[in-house]
Amino acid sequence: MMKEKFIMADGTALHVADSGRGERCVVLIHGYLESMYVWDDFVPLLTPEVRVVTVDVPGHGISQVLGEVHTMEMMADVMRGMLDALGIERATFVGHSMGGYISLAFCARYPERLDGL
């Protein structure tokens, strides 16, 4: 069961949902003008096997807006802060559309925190 909550990630209020269990973790990142709810059909398929985290990236859903421009690198930094806030050392990132670009930026900046894309 996913638990929705707000966390602070590098000073940014993020709306996340976390299954909270599993040895491995998968982070699902939505696309432009979407929200974490686009993953609702996938979450039940994954949660028996892995910990699943979904997130409204900054400026989307009900997460905090940080300004007019949200670069992929800035969002990757916030994703690192999210992992830290949730106590997750490493994760596999799955991104749709813009979420894919955020995942690639995360890979470039924090390869040691990534299990896969």
Residue ranges and their predicted role:
Residues 40, 80, 104-108:
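Short, hydrophobic alpha-helix immediately C-terminal to the catalytic nucleophile
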Residues 89-117:
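Conserved hydrolase catalytic core segment
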Residues 1-13:
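N-terminal cap/lid segment of alpha/beta-hydrolase-fold proteins
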Residues 9, 17, 53-95:
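Active-site loop/oxyanion-hole signature of alpha/beta-hydrolase fold enzymes
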Residues 43-47, 69-72, 110-111:
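Glycine-rich, phosphate-binding/catalytic loops in enzymes
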Residues 12-65:
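Conserved HGGG/HGGXW glycine-rich cap/lid loop of the alpha/beta-hydrolase fold
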Residues 11, 21-23, 48, 84-90, ...:
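Active-site acidic short loop of glycosyltransferases
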